[in-house]
Amino acid sequence: MSLHQERKSELVSKFRTHESDTGSPEVQVALLSERITMLTEHFKTHKKDHHSRRGLLKLVGQRRRLLDYLKSKDVARYKKLIDGLGIRK
């Protein structure tokens, strides 16, 4: 499952830090969160798809590492990102 190009560019433009930014932690976390959401919806109908579930767990771990990195570097950017994505309480 991949993101559609329109949705991907929409996320990049929303979370980028400067005009040509496509690889900052904010953008990467936003793209990973969208893929995680898509896979979560997939598992509501395909409960026994354990192969894809492993991929989901890898994505969640990668997002966690990026969030930890961002939190250690700049707490304000971290808080803005999690508020924008709605992924923490």
UniProtKB/Swiss-Prot annotation:
InterPro entries for the chain: Ribosomal_uS15, Ribosomal_uS15_bac-type, uS15_NS1_RNA-bd_sf
Compositionally biased residues, Basic and acidic residues: 1-21
SMART domains: Ribosomal_S15 (SM01387)
Cellular component GO terms held in the UniProt record: cytosolic small ribosomal subunit
Single GO molecular function: rRNA binding
Positions of the UniProt region annotated as Disordered: 1-25
GO terms for biological process, alphabetical: translation
Its job: One of the primary rRNA binding proteins, it binds directly to 16S rRNA where it helps nucleate assembly of the platform of the 30S subunit by binding and bridging several RNA helices of the 16S rRNA.
Subunit structure: Part of the 30S ribosomal subunit. Forms a bridge to the 50S subunit in the 70S ribosome, contacting the 23S rRNA.
Protein name: Small ribosomal subunit protein uS15
Source species of the chain: Myxococcus xanthus (strain DK1622)
